[in-house]
Amino acid sequence: MKIDTRGYGETARAYAYRVIRENIISLDLEPGSPFNDMEFSRRIGISRTPVREAVIQLSEESRIIEVFPQKGMRIALIDVDLVEEARFLRLLLEKAVAELACDMAVPEDIEQLRENVKLQNFYMEEGSPKKLLELDNEMHRILFVLCRKELTYNMCRRLAIHYDRIRSLSVNTVKDRTIIE
């Protein structure tokens, strides 16, 4: 499991949420594996309450952690139906955002997108799948923000966690990758 440092001003709950979520997406916390909130809170150096709150939030918003009262918790298996729903949502929204972006983008936005694609190509050649996914997510965020749809982007990110695990799995296994500009 990878543990990032806590951000300045980041609440304990937000920190726990971010670290758990990132480790689930990267598959460092494997689908079907048990999750021990007491051990996790010890490892990241915060009390158990914010960890439990983060687990409840993840369980409710994306069904990514299964909570069994009096028994324990486990990382949910990848739900194919939720993957398909997230794919469908992205297909519809990203098409609409791309059309809006064509009308709303200024030269600085286009340059920022070009720079992002260059970095994606660099990290693809370097064999850094985690960084590649981060940059891809950032490219989509840039598009949503320039269209003034950041709330929509954030909503999609919360719903797409099962889809993101499939993306993480595929980017780590596919050998011949190219980015089309």
Residue spans of the language-model regions?
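Short linear motifs at protein or domain termini
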Residues: 1-99, 103
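C-terminal-biased regions
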Residues: 5, 57, 168-181
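Mobile beta-alpha loop/short-helix "lid" or hinge segments that flank ligand
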Residues: 60-66, 157-161, 177
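A ubiquitous short alpha-helical element
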Residues: 78-84, 101-106, 123-128, 168-176
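Hydrophobic faces of stable alpha-helices that mediate helix-helix packing
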Residues: 87-95, 110-114, 177-181
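Short, surface-exposed, polar/charged, turn-prone segments marking secondary-structure boundaries
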Residues: 93-96, 102-104, 161, 172-174, ...
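Conserved amphipathic alpha-helical segments that form helical-bundle/coiled-coil interaction surfaces
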Residues: 107-168, 180-181
